[in-house]
Amino acid sequence: MIDISSLAKRMVEQSKNPQKKIQPHNSLHKSDFKFLYVIGKGGFGRVWKIQSKKTKTKYALKEMSKVRIIDKKSEKSINSEREFLSKLNHPFIVNMHYAFQDKDNLYLVMDLLNGGDLRFHISRYRKFSEEQTRFFIANMIYALEYIHENNVIHRDIKPENLVLEDKGYCRITDFGIAKENMPDNS
């Protein structure tokens, strides 16, 4: 039997980078990217599969309408999500690479994951083997441990916010209702 937790731990150790801080990029514009197609829609806009024209790297781009954000009184939530993602970088979360805006929209350029969310896989397969379940749980534990070490509480762990990558690793996404862990949050 494969030791799932040591496999996940080894991936974390191999990919440890100095923590990167992502700052909003005033010099970036959506014209720096080739928009390939829409991969999702949400309350504020669309999620695109894009490619950097400079590096050819593919990403997911969250395009959010400023008007919709204001109409739904969600400025604080969107700003918090961007702020949390700008300080987090881990192999088991969906990482943000860039953040920028134009007069109409806010943009978050994030890791592109093609494996679908866990809700889709649960509805498709109905159940997972014990080994696969342990593997997903180990991924989530490492991600949550890292998130908590950085004083962030996710507050919305559910199958739709757990996305699989091509190699089968599970990553946490959607920090929209996350909160900073303050001493009085205990």
Which ranges hold each PLM region?
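Eukaryotic serine/threonine protein kinase catalytic domain
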Residues: P24-S186
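Intrinsically disordered, low-complexity regulatory segments that flank or precede the catalytic domain
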Residues: M1-N26
